[in-house]
Amino acid sequence: MQIILSILEWIYLNVRYFLRKGKNKQESLDVIKHAEMKNINDEERFIFRRMAEGDMEAFRFFFEKYYVDLCNFVNIYLNDPATAEDIVQDVYVYFWNKKENIHIETSIKSYLLKASKNKSLNYLR
């Protein structure tokens, strides 16, 4: 388990590095895609179940854990940090409002990344 956590931490740090260093958009997206193809873990599954039952602390956990990464990810598409934050907030509002009906097969983060990407592309249309 410790090895898996170390690998995930390494992936996370590398994703952050690519985003900060301004590598080309596709390279950054490929790193994120590779990092997020993991299945939902037991901790996230438990916290997500609590959130689906209306627990705001569980929602706050996901918000605080992924907010910055999602904003950076959306900003790749929009190149506008303020609009990126608005889109991520909209994604979280949707996530909270539909919590009882959402079925996540991969990780929570990959679900939020996909929702953020879709909302960003809709914004650009």
Question: Where are the language model's segments positioned?
Answer:
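Arg/Lys-rich amphipathic alpha helix in sigma70-family domain 2
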Residues: 100-103, 117-125
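Conserved catalytic core of Hanks-type protein kinase domains
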Residues: 65, 77, 86, 114-115, ...
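Short, charged helix-capping/linker segments at alpha-helix termini
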Residues: 52-61, 71-90
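Conserved hydrophobic/aromatic "anchor" residues
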Residues: 59, 63-66, 71, 92, ...
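Short alpha-helical functional segments enriched in proximate histidine and acidic residues
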Residues: 73, 94, 119, 123
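Sigma70-family region 2
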Residues: 52-53, 79, 90-107
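Structural recognition of an alpha-helix C-terminal capping motif at a helix-to-coil junction
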Residues: 86-93, 106-118
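N-terminal module of bacterial RNA polymerase sigma factors
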Residues: 1-68
